[in-house]
């Protein structure tokens, strides 16, 4: 039931709000370095030393609360297990990456190859867990249903890897990723309620609760960042939720911000290589472009709050449009 999910969300939010300050104190007590700041963005100088890995708190709390709730309310289904597994495993990848950077002072963290291999393995296991409860290999595009058979396994891997990294790129300024993802997940919560998929709804609402609790400390000026442990987990979670709700295509609208952020990086890199050093944007991902003045020529651009609000509203509007189209077909 919806009420069960709301209760789980509130509990997750409260525990996260209680847990984050203690996590911040741990970082300060151990004198651990925070997330590296961007030298080209002068506004970020004040962020030096800010603790990271805050995603560890809301991820763990969301996982524990949703698991207990699923067992208590009888929602421990293959769909729930799949969503839970993906969220947890992508968090593990992010945690290892953050751990190497923060605790072992290895700036690169996990190598790109290590991350990719881990994400592919998680995608393969996710496919088998998903297939245990869902026998069809159908991708839903508006009113069309395309059966891609064995290639569905490849689709799941690409979908998970793509969206996890897209959300990771979006997590670049205070509060941006946490609320943008919360808005995206709210759209999927609506779909889950309408289709009475309360097993998936339970974990969706738990994660939203965790994000709201985290935002209390992550808004400008942020006292803590979520790190890869949070952003990679959220991206993978969004991807698998869209699959479990048979609404894969909607993520292209609901997650348009993540798509734009990713495309800005890809275009910048390609153009830079082709022109021998020229740039399309002042800096990517594109939220930094707006911070640095955008195409206006000004030395200082939008504030972090302005970027946040514009991106949140953009996500909210496109989410409503996606839902309208989804239910129309």
Swiss-Prot record:
GO MF terms, alphabetically ordered: metal ion binding; phospho-N-acetylmuramoyl-pentapeptide-transferase activity
Catalytic activity: UDP-N-acetyl-alpha-D-muramoyl-L-alanyl-gamma-D-glutamyl-L-lysyl-D-alanyl-D-alanine + di-trans,octa-cis-undecaprenyl phosphate = Mur2Ac(oyl-L-Ala-gamma-D-Glu-L-Lys-D-Ala-D-Ala)-di-trans,octa-cis-undecaprenyl diphosphate + UMP
Protein name per its UniProtKB record: Phospho-N-acetylmuramoyl-pentapeptide-transferase
GO BP terms in the entry: cell division; cell wall organization; peptidoglycan biosynthetic process; regulation of cell shape
Keywords: Cell cycle, Cell division, Cell membrane, Cell shape, Cell wall biogenesis/degradation, Magnesium, Membrane, Metal-binding, Peptidoglycan synthesis, Transferase, Transmembrane, Transmembrane helix
A GO CC term attached to the entry: plasma membrane
Topology of the protein relative to the lipid bilayer: Multi-pass membrane protein
Pathway(s) it belongs to: Cell wall biogenesis; peptidoglycan biosynthesis
Disulphide-bridged cysteine pairs: none
Family per similarity comment: Belongs to the glycosyltransferase 4 family. MraY subfamily.
Secretion signal, residue range per the UniProt entry: none
EC number: 2.7.8.13
Its biological purpose: Catalyzes the initial step of the lipid cycle reactions in the biosynthesis of the cell wall peptidoglycan: transfers peptidoglycan precursor phospho-MurNAc-pentapeptide from UDP-MurNAc-pentapeptide onto the lipid carrier undecaprenyl phosphate, yielding undecaprenyl-pyrophosphoryl-MurNAc-pentapeptide, known as lipid I.
Localization of this protein: Cell membrane
Record InterPro entries: Glycosyl_transferase_4, PNAcMuramoyl-5peptid_Trfase, PNAcMuramoyl-5peptid_Trfase_CS
One Pfam family named in its UniProt record: Glycos_transf_4
Organism of derivation: Lactococcus lactis subsp. cremoris (strain SK11)
HAMAP family membership: MraY
Cofactor: Mg(2+)
Principal subcellular localization: membrane
Chain segments annotated as transmembrane: 1-21, 53-73, 76-96, 109-129, 141-161, 175-195, 198-218, 237-257, 309-329
């Amino acid at each position: 039931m919806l009420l069960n999910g709301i209760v789980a969300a509130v509990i997750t939010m409260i525990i996260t709000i209680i847990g984050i300050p203690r996590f911040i104190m741990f970082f300060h007590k151990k004198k651990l370095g925070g997330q590296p700041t961007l030298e080209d963005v002068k506004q970020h100088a004040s962020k030096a030393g800010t603790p990271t890995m805050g995603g560890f708190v809301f991820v763990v709390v969301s996982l524990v609360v949703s698991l207990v709730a699923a067992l208590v309310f009888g929602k421990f289904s293959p769909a729930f297990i799949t969503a839970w597994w993906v969220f947890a495993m992508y968090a593990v990848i992010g945690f290892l990456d953050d751990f190497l950077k923060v605790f072992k002072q290895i700036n690169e963290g996990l190598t790109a190859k290590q991350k990719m291999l881990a994400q592919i393995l998680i995608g393969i296991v996710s496919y088998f867990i998903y297939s245990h409860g869902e026998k069809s290999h159908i991708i839903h595009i508006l009113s069309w249903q395309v059966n891609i058979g064995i290639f569905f396994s490849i689709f799941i891997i690409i979908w998970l890897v793509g969206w996890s990294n897209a959300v990771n790129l979006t997590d670049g300024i205070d509060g941006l990723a946490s609320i943008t993802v919360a808005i995206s997940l709210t759209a999927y919560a609506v779909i889950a309620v309408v289709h009475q998929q309360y097993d998936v709804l339970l974990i969706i609402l738990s994660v939203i609760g965790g994000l709201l609790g985290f935002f209390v400390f992550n808004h400008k000026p942020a006292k803590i960042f979520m790190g890869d442990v949070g952003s990679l987990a959220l991206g993978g979670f969004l991807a698998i939720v869209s699959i479990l709700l048979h609404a894969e295509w909607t993520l292209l609208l609901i997650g348009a911000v993540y798509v734009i952020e990713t495309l800005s990086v890809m275009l910048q890199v390609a153009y830079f290589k082709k022109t021998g050093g020229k740039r399309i944007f002042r800096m990517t991902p594109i939220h930094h472009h707006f911070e640095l003045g955008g195409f206006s020529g000004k030395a200082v651009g939008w504030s972090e709050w302005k970027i946040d609000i514009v991106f949140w509203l953009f996500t909210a509007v496109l989410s409503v449009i996606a839902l309208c189209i989804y239910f129309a077909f």
